[in-house]
Curated annotation (Swiss-Prot):
The lineage of its organism: Eukaryota, Metazoa, Chordata, Craniata, Vertebrata. This is Sarcalumenin. It comes from Mus musculus (Mouse). Belongs to the TRAFAC class dynamin-like GTPase superfamily. Dynamin/Fzo/YdjA family. Glycans are attached at residues 280, 388. Disulfide bonds: none annotated. One of its GO terms (biological process) is store-operated calcium entry. The gene is Srl.
Length: 472
C-alpha cells in the first residue's frame, strides 16, 4: 500500500513538472508581429465607418418594388430555394471557413481577430473541437446568442435557417465581439469534415446547411493541414457544392512551417492532384501557403514567403470588404435576371399548355407531355430568342419537372395578365431594374452621388434613359 502511495506521488510530481515545462515553453515561445494585419485591413485608421444606409435603402426599395412581385407571383423560391431577406440585403460581407477537422480554422479566426488568450477566443485543440456553426459578429460587448434567437430575429440574415429544424438551431451559435474588423465583415466557423462519420449522425442536413452558407458567402476559405491531406467522400461532396463559386474560393495550406521545403513542395503538388477532379475550371483557385497562428514561424523555414502569402490573403479579404456595395448590387441584379428568366419560362409553359388544350383534351396528360419533353415544344429555344437571355443562365430542364410537380400550372397567370393600371406590369418593372435602376445605383457609388437623386449626366433629366444592354 505504501509502495502504491509512493508511486502515485511520483507520477503526480512528473505530471506537474511536465505541465510546468509546457507552461514555461509557451511563455518563452516568441509571438509574431501583428502590425501588418492592422495595416493591411486599415484597422488603425480613426476615420468613421462609411455610411452605406442610403444606398442599401435604395437597393432594398428596388428589390421590393421591382423584383419581389414577379418572384412571388411565379414562386421562384421553390425553384432555387434562395429567399432574399432584408437582413441579407443589408448584411455585411460574409467570410466562410470550411475544411477537414483540426486544420486550424478556429485558430486562424482567433489569429486574424487577435482573440488568443482572451475570453472571446474560439476553443481550439488537436481533436475535433468545433461541432457548431459559429457566427462571429460585431457587438458593443461580448455576447453569445443562441441559434433559435438568431433565426427568430428578422433583422438578421439568418432567419431562413429555421427550415433546417430545431436540431440544427441547437448547433448554431452567434458570438458578438467588440472588434473593429467585425464592424465590416462577418466570420462563420464550421464543423470540420470527418470522413469516417456519416452525415446522418450529425442529426441535421449538414450538406444542405453548408450549401446555404456557401450561397451567401462573399469569400470562402477552404483550409487544409499539409500533414494530413485526406480527400474523401465528404470533401468531394463539399467541392461539388462549391461548383459555380470558384471566384470566391481561396484554398489555404495552413501550418506550412511544420514541413521542410522539399516536403512542402510535394504536399502542394499532392493537394492539387487530389483536388483536380473536383475543380473543373480553367483557372484554379488561389492557394495561400502560410501558418495562421500567433506563434512565430519555426526556424529554418521560408518566413518571408509565408509573410507575403499572409499579406496577400489579407489584401484579398480587404478587397471584398471595400467592394461590399458593388458585390451586393451585382448579386441582386443577377438574382433579378434569374427571376426574369424563370418567369418567362413559366409563361411559355403556360402559353404552350393553353395552345395545345382543346375541349376534349385531358389537361393533365397534355401538360405532362410538355414537361417531359419541353424541347419538342421549343420552350427553351423560344426563351433564348428573347432580348438579354443567355443560354448559360437557363435553369436545368429537369428542375421544372420537380417545380411543376408541386406547383400546378393552373396556379399561374400569363405575364400579359400581370399588369395593373396603377402599378404597371411586373415584367416591365423587373426589366427596368435590370437595365436602368441597378446599373444607375452602381454608378452612383463610384461617383459619390446621392443614390436617391436622379442621374442627369448622360441622358438629361426628363429624357428616357437609354438601355445600355439592348442590342441594336
Amino acid at each position: 500500500m505504501k509502495a502504491l502511495l509512493l508511486l502515485c506521488c511520483f507520477l503526480a510530481s512528473l505530471l506537474l513538472s511536465g505541465q510546468a515545462e509546457v507552461e514555461d515553453a509557451s511563455e518563452e515561445a516568441p509571438l509574431r508581429d501583428r502590425s501588418h494585419i492592422d495595416k493591411t485591413l486599415m484597422l488603425n485608421e480613426d476615420k468613421p465607418a462609411d455610411d452605406y444606409s442610403a444606398v442599401l435603402q435604395r437597393l432594398r426599395k428596388i428589390y421590393h418594388t421591382s423584383i419581389k412581385p414577379l418572384e412571388q407571383s411565379y414562386k421562384y423560391n421553390e425553384l432555387r430555394q434562395h429567399e432574399i431577406t432584408d437582413g441579407e440585403i443589408t448584411s455585411k460581407p460574409m467570410v466562410l471557413f470550411l475544411g477537414p477537422w483540426s486544420v486550424g480554422k478556429s485558430t486562424m479566426i482567433n489569429y486574424l481577430l487577435g482573440l488568443e488568450d482572451t475570453r472571446y477566443q474560439l476553443y481550439t485543440g488537436a481533436e475535433p473541437t468545433t461541432s457548431e456553426f459559429t457566427v462571429l459578429m460585431h457587438g458593443p460587448k461580448l455576447k453569445t446568442i443562441e441559434g433559435i434567437v438568431m433565426a427568430a430575429d428578422s433583422a438578421r440574415s439568418f432567419s431562413p435557417l429555421e427550415k433546417f429544424g430545431q436540431n440544427f438551431l441547437e448547433k448554431l451559435i452567434g458570438i458578438e465581439v467588440p472588434h473593429k474588423l467585425l464592424e465590416r465583415v462577418t466570420f462563420v466557423d464550421t464543423p470540420g469534415i470527418i470522413e469516417n462519420r456519416k452525415q446522418q449522425e450529425r442529426g441535421y442536413p449538414f450538406n444542405d446547411v453548408c450549401q446555404w452558407f456557401i450561397d451567401r458567402a462573399d469569400l470562402i476559405f477552404v483550409v487544409f493541414d499539409p500533414t494530413k491531406l485526406d480527400v474523401g467522400l465528404e470533401l468531394e461532396m463539399l467541392f461539388r457544392q462549391l461548383k459555380g463559386r470558384e471566384s470566391q474560393i481561396r484554398i489555404i495550406l495552413n501550418k506550412a512551417d511544420n514541413l521542410a521545403t522539399q516536403m512542402l513542395m510535394r504536399v502542394y503538388g499532392a493537394l492539387f492532384w487530389s483536388l483536380a477532379p473536383l475543380i473543373n475550371v480553367t483557372e484554379p483557385p488561389r492557394v495561400y501557403v502560410s501558418s495562421f497562428w500567433p506563434q512565430d514561424y519555426k526556424p529554418d523555414t521560408h518566413r518571408e514567403l509565408f509573410l507575403k502569402e499572409e499579406i496577400s490573403l489579407l489584401e484579398d479579404l480587404n478587397q471584398v470588404i471595400e467592394n461590399r456595395l458593388e458585390n451586393k448590387i451585382a448579386f441582386i441584379r443577377q438574382h433579378a435576371i434569374r427571376v426574369r428568366i424563370h418567369a418567362l419560362l413559366v409563361d411559355r409553359y403556360l402559353q404552350t399548355y393553353k395552345d395545345k388544350m382543346t375541349f376534349f383534351s385531358d389537361g393533365e396528360l397534355v401538360f405532362k407531355d410538355i414537361v417531359e419533353d419541353p424541347d419538342k415544344f421549343y420552350i427553351f429555344k423560344t426563351i433564348l430568342a428573347k432580348t438579354n437571355v443567355s443560354k448559360f443562365d437557363l435553369p436545368n430542364r429537369e428542375a421544372y419537372k420537380d417545380f411543376f410537380g408541386i406547383n400546378p400550372i393552373s396556379n399561374f397567370k400569363l405575364l400579359s395578365q400581370q399588369c395593373s393600371y396603377m402599378g404597371g406590369c411586373f415584367l416591365e418593372k423587373i426589366e427596368r431594374a435590370i437595365t436602368q435602376e441597378l446599373p444607375s445605383l452602381l454608378g452612383s457609388i463610384g461617383l459619390g452621388k446621392n443614390p436617391g437623386a436622379p442621374n442627369c449626366d448622360k441622358t438629361g433629366c426628363g429624357e428616357t434613359p437609354k438601355n445600355r444592354y439592348k442590342k441594336h
